[in-house]
Amino acid sequence: MKILNKILIGSLSLLCLSSCDFLDETAYNKVTVGNFYTTKDGITNGVNGLYSTLRGMYIQEYLIYMCEGPSDIWIGHQGHEQWYNWTIDATNADVRSFWYSCYKSVNQCNAVIESLENNDIPGLDEDLKTRFLAESLFIRAHYFYHLVQQFGDIPMPLKPTNSVETTAHKTKVDEVWNQIVTDLEFAVENLPETYQASEFGHITKYAAMHHLSRVYLTLKRSDDDLKKALNYAEQVINSGKYSLVKSHAELWDINNKNNSEVLFSVLYTQNAELNGDGNTAHMYFCSAYSEEHPAVKRVIEYGRPWSRERSSDFAISLFDKTKDQRWDDCFISRWNVTENSVTENVFSPFTKKVEEKVWTKGELAMIDPREPWTPEQIKEVWPVLVFLPEYMREQIDPLMDVQSEQNPNAEWPSNTRFTSYKMYAYLVKHLDPLRPEVNWTAGSRNVFVYRLADTYLLAAEAAFLSGNAQKAAEYINVVRRRAAVPGHEAEMEIKSSDVTIDFILDERARELMGEMHRWYDLKRTN
């Protein structure tokens, strides 16, 4: 027995000693950032991957709250009151998501930048290497732009983080802006003017100029900053590479996403295997139209109604609907019957009795004129539901002034309704009619980050602040003529005496509502 025990103990000892070598893993096929970005294919995929990071931001729900929501042109949905009563703190999930997304992407940019700056990559010629570096610096600058606008002093890592770091050091606002300018100026000098069709979506020299114009306009530390803002915007305008499309209806046609007006866009695809979470913005501006009428149900054409952002009464008041085509082109304010046949009992303002109404597919069912109508106007379209501005509810509802079987002689017809946080005319810029079914979340619409109409308005702002109101009016009029109802182009034009910062802000709201600019516009103009 003693001999057996000695043999057993010896065997276990040998096993323990040999197990150390047995458990040591040699990672012959392990891929790390360090070696992946040192090949031509690896660094090419790395740069392309930086564009994919932009999908993590454009347009997620949190970005809407950060860039559009807390402003004069939007009213928020219940459950997101923090954004509209200015009680945001570090526990807010949207803020955390924004912060995490930006810094995760910055770190990815830094890894690519470090590899490009420090490695001789076989097969990668100097021109392509420089272009890759310019693209990477632009995207990093874009994230820093968002971060410094939202938070002021921020951590500004310029090297990749490869291990856990438990402390962070803030960089002063001025230093962050200086780095953004440095990166964007490098991009302007080294990005191409155009790409092959197969590389559509990559950042061009003119996209970088547009971004620099916005940055210098934001800084406006001196007359020289304003001069640079105007110069960069005018270089884009005069390049001959871009032109305004004919109308907003054409601009927002989802089948026209690679149009002549777009300077830079984040790309999505209908291929579900490649689209990831997709573009979900189609849900957030859409009202709950399917909850108001028995014959109107969810359909792809009208969108998936998550009701997150409602345009304010002030925003709607900015549109002269008689001569500004942007109202009809950019908003849904009329809904047709979506069902084949629905029978409803409705109270008639004519007979003062309940009558049977058979709704048929395609006929008009609801209108939100976003302005007061008289009882006579509402009666004329009966039984179509008419949604009056919400403030009118206080004047009418408490008086029981809407007709019904119990109240047949009330002043307001039975088809009178009121807008609410759930039901309203809504923006169509993000709707996605190419989704395979109505509840499909992962949209495929491209996001237009920069477009030429914005460039014209940046140029107008820079010109006005430089003392040239005439030039500002000329640039604004280019945008307004395109926006005119046909035949009203001359009426849409303004004079130099009309130009003020407030007018420019109003025009930016009319033109760019819902495109992730509003809060930065208000912040820039105080």
Predicted regions located by residue number:
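Bacterial Sec-dependent N-terminal signal peptides
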Residues: 1-29
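Long, intrinsically disordered, low-complexity segments
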Residues: 20-22, 59, 63, 89, ...
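An aromatic- and glycine-enriched ligand-binding surface/loop that stacks and positions planar moieties
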Residues: 21-77, 206-209, 214-393
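Conserved, well-structured interaction surfaces
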Residues: 39-40, 44-57, 78-151, 171-178, ...
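C-terminal substrate/ligand-recognition segments
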Residues: 337-342, 346-477
